[in-house]
């Protein structure tokens, strides 16, 4: 059995859909790291920090188990977009995407008793212009909350994606194909 060390509903749904036996363990992480580095390095550091925090707090309860740590960020060019703190920040992030593109970087660390596997994947989504009413509803109803870069591929954004380069599961927060290869 896999232990998903994350409160992410999207990641849990991806594992269920892939028929991977898992148990979800929610944990509050401090994800505040310096964003003045490459987005690729940033998302990897976040995953390693999640592992450190989880193991320092709950490690003794999960010895010799298969643990999965993951994180996703959105970047536009080299600008890192994490989770919006409020509606103002959500509108700013969405304005950067409107009629343009955004890349989702998803990293995971699979810790097994016999090995560690680290994966970094990228999916780029290209958007047509957002409908102003749909955008307002999305933000004002707080649907952006908890979403890296305010991107909701399975909701608001799906109506505006013109094409994508990369796997949808990566955009949803976890590269399932790569994970399955190492389970």
Curated annotation (Swiss-Prot):
Indicate yes or no for the key word Hydrolase.
Answer: yes
Q: What cofactor does its activity depend on?
A: a divalent metal cation
Q: What is its subcellular localisation?
A: Cytoplasm
GO molecular function term, any single one: nucleoside triphosphate diphosphatase activity
- Main localization category: cytoplasm
Q: Which domain of life is it from?
A: Bacteria
**Any one cellular component term from GO for this entry?**
cytoplasm
GO terms for biological process?
nucleotide metabolic process
Record-linked InterPro entries: ITPase-like_fam, Maf-like
Active site (UniProt) = 71 (proton acceptor)
Q: What is its EC number?
A: 3.6.1.9
Under which main EC class is this enzyme filed?
hydrolase
Catalytic reaction(s) noted: a ribonucleoside 5'-triphosphate + H2O = a ribonucleoside 5'-phosphate + diphosphate + H(+); a 2'-deoxyribonucleoside 5'-triphosphate + H2O = a 2'-deoxyribonucleoside 5'-phosphate + diphosphate + H(+)
Sorted alphabetically, which keywords does the UniProt record give?
Cytoplasm, Hydrolase, Nucleotide metabolism
Q: Which ranges form a coiled coil?
A: none
Q: List the disulfide bonds.
A: none
Its biological purpose: Nucleoside triphosphate pyrophosphatase. May have a dual role in cell division arrest and in preventing the incorporation of modified nucleotides into cellular nucleic acids.
Kindly give the HAMAP family that the UniProt entry links to this protein: Maf
Could you tell me which PANTHER family the record lists for this protein?
BIFUNCTIONAL DTTP/UTP PYROPHOSPHATASE/METHYLTRANSFERASE PROTEIN-RELATED (PTHR43213), BIFUNCTIONAL DTTP_UTP PYROPHOSPHATASE_METHYLTRANSFERASE PROTEIN-RELATED (PTHR43213:SF5)
Query: What is the designated name of this protein?
Result: Nucleoside triphosphate pyrophosphatase
Which organism does this sequence originate in? Campylobacter jejuni subsp. jejuni serotype O:6 (strain 81116 / NCTC 11828)
């Amino acid at each position: 059995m896999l232990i998903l060390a994350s409160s992410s509903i999207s990641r849990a749904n991806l594992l269920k859909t892939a028929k991977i036996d898992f148990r979800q363990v929610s944990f509050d992480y401090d994800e505040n790291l310096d964003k003045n580095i490459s987005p690729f390095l940033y998302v990897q550091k976040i995953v390693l920090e999640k592992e450190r925090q989880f193991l320092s707090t709950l490690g003794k309860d999960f010895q010799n188990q298969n643990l999965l740590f993951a994180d996703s960020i959105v970047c536009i060019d080299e600008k890192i977009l994490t989770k919006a703190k409020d509606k103002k920040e959500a509108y700013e992030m969405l304005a950067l995407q409107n009629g343009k593109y955004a890349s989702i970087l998803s990293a995971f660390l699979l810790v097994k008793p016999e090995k560690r596997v680290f994966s970094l994947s990228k999916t780029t989504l290209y958007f047509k212009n957002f409908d102003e009413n749909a955008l307002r509803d999305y933000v004002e109803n707080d649907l952006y909350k908890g979403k890296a870069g305010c991107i909701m591929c399975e909701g608001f954004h799906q109506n505006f994606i013109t094409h994508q380069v990369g796997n949808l599961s990566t955009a949803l927060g976890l590269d399932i194909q790569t994970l399955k290869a190492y389970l």
